[in-house]
């Protein structure tokens, strides 16, 4: 799968986004030393390697592990990071994709320098300090109070501000994301109009709110389809020691099924 990056996309320091940034970001996602166990398989099961084009810094080819209809969309989920900022010494340049996928990575590939690099890269501060949250979007994180709120502000010199596409248009100067952890507080905030938008409302709460005239006057609300599904998995082959064998009884499985709306 060969891609061509749109021209004119720039990092906050004015340097252009290149295919090397993409290659670096993929290596970060695939490397076993990165603290991303939960999502690494999203990429390692799809991406085999990245090939750059020396004569075109915006072009690259992704070789997939196997043929699949969704392979070409993998980069829509990739967190692209600035190589010059995170790897100025080009440490990952010395690590091939074959090395990253090697079963002997920990024994044969990892060096003290590489280990030190990832110990620094994986520090918690890199995930929360606004000055280190570098991106290509229209907004910059300016304040993050853990468990309370996140503030993002519009970049004045953003590369896409003259693009008329609706996807590249940013309106508010500042957006505050309030972290509300329970549905009762969300409902109360909507009733008191202390928030402008929420997607964290359960079905019953929204249906109750839609019965209120003041809510309908101040908010536009509705139910939308999601590209997702929910399921209940039953372990029908437990070991009988740590997991009891009660799901082997079809009547138990049937009873559980009756509890699902």
Describe each model-derived feature in a short phrase.
Residues 2-38, 49-53, 67, 127-132, ...:
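Extracytoplasmic/periplasmic ligand-capture domains
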Residues 4, 40-116, 145:
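Surface-exposed binding/hinge segments that line
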Residues 31, 80, 87, 119, ...:
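Generic surface-pattern signal
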Residues 113-132:
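Intrinsically disordered, low-complexity acidic Ser/Thr-rich regulatory segments
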């Amino acid at each position: 799968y060969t891609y061509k990056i749109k021209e004119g996309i720039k990092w906050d320091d004015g340097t252009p986004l290149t295919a090397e940034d993409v290659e670096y970001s993929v290596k970060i996602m695939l490397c076993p030393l990165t603290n991303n166990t939960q999502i690494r398989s999203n990429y390692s099961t799809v991406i085999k390697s990245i090939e750059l084009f020396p004569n075109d810094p915006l072009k690259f080819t992704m070789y997939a592990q196997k043929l699949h209809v969704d392979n070409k969309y993998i980069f829509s989920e990739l967190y692209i990071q600035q190589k010059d900022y995170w790897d100025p010494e080009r440490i990952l340049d010395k690590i091939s994709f074959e090395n990253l996928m090697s079963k002997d990575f920990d024994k044969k590939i990892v060096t003290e320098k590489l280990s030190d690099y990832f110990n620094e890269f994986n520090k918690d501060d890199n995930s929360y300090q606004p000055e280190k949250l570098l991106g290509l979007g229209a907004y910059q994180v300016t304040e993050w109070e853990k468990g309370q709120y996140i503030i993002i502000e519009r970049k004045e010199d953003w590369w896409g501000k003259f693009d008329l596409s609706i996807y590249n248009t940013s309106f508010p100067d500042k957006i505050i994301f309030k972290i509300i952890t329970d549905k009762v507080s969300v409902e109360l905030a909507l009733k008191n109009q202390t928030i402008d938008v929420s997607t964290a409302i359960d079905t019953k709460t929204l249906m109750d709110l839609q019965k209120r005239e003041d809510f309908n006057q101040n908010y536009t609300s509705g139910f939308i389809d999601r590209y997702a599904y929910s399921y209940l998995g039953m372990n029908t082959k437990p070991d009988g020691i740590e997991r009891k064998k009660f799901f082997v009884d079809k009547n138990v499985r049937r009873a559980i099924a009756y509890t699902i709306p």
